Amino acid sequence: LGVSEYSNIEQTLTRYFGSARFSVTDAMHIIAGFNAIDFERTGQNAGAVIDNSESEASPYVGATYAVTEDVNAYVSYSDVYQPQEQYDVNGQYLDPTKGKNFEAGFKAQWFDDRLLTTFAYFTAEQDNLAAYAGTNPETLQYYYKGVSVESDGFEIELAGQLTDDLRINASYTNIDVEDEQGNDANLWAPRDVV
């Protein structure tokens, strides 16, 4: 008589966040804040005992500058901390993903605010991001490993109503994602989006 292995997991995620906005000049504003997580996960997964407890605070900061009445520049930075749902080869949850994001760009309004254009450049680094590593032949459960990836890209967008009969909404995004060895990573994610 065999014994069936099962999963019975209880998890609690509590987020705390706060921010403050400062006007440095009439044209320049700064926002700073944090996003904190208290995370607890206990139970059993296919025979493996699960007992995780994590707490982490991630800061972020950003600034905007009104170049003209219709053109604004911005820059932002944030830390990343995200618990994961994927298991490793031993049936344990992967440790959280940690990293940092940076973005800079412009937003401009044209034709009496009827057309909005944006351009953004972004880059991110993530450590311990879940990547498929195989299938357990006994349980048929997928397992994953944590990898480090770097991504960068840009986005261009046009949106607005130029006339009563002409509305435009167009965008293009390009992203490059590489692992520690410089190989393409996250191949499931599109590299060009129109």
Segments predicted by a language model, with ranges:
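Structural signature of Gram-negative outer-membrane beta-barrels, strongest in the C-terminal barrel
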Residues: 7-126, 173
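Conserved catalytic-core segments of large NTP-driven translation/proteostasis enzymes
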Residues: 135
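Extracellular loop and loop/strand-boundary signature of outer-membrane beta-barrel proteins
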Residues: 2-6, 19, 42-50, 86-93, ...
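Gram-negative outer-membrane beta-barrel transporters
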Residues: 26-27, 144-194
